[in-house]
Amino acid sequence: MKKGIHPENYRTVLFYDSNAKQGFLIRSCARTTTTMKWEDGHEYPVFMCDTSSASHPYYTGKTRQIANEGRASDFVNRYGKFGTLKSK
């Protein structure tokens, strides 16, 4: 690396995905306040991530179904039986 072009706090940081329970060692300037012991026995500053390539559906191939149906079908499911006529 060329000297003098990187910030002073450019160091190895552990980016830890809390959903996948997996970490990545990356050189970064991210500000951190906590440290974590890594698999190699060294202690690194840790940056907690909610999503990374280990847990994102695009990279894992797993799909999440948030809403299968629209608002109209929710209405029909809730109130559809009130419009039917009952025979005596």
From Swiss-Prot:
GO MF, any single term: structural constituent of ribosome
GO cellular component, one term: ribonucleoprotein complex
Stored InterPro entries: Ribosomal_bL28/bL31-like_sf, Ribosomal_bL31, Ribosomal_bL31_B, Ribosomal_bL31_sf
GO terms for biological process, alphabetical: translation
PROSITE patterns the record matches: RIBOSOMAL_L31
Keywords assigned: Ribonucleoprotein, Ribosomal protein
Record NCBIfam families: L31 (TIGR00105), PRK01678.1 (NF002462)
Family under the similarity heading: Belongs to the bacterial ribosomal protein bL31 family. Type B subfamily.
Quaternary assembly: Part of the 50S ribosomal subunit.
Name used for this protein in its record: Large ribosomal subunit protein bL31B
Lineage: Bacteria, Pseudomonadati, Pseudomonadota, Gammaproteobacteria, Pasteurellales
Designated gene of the protein: rpmE2
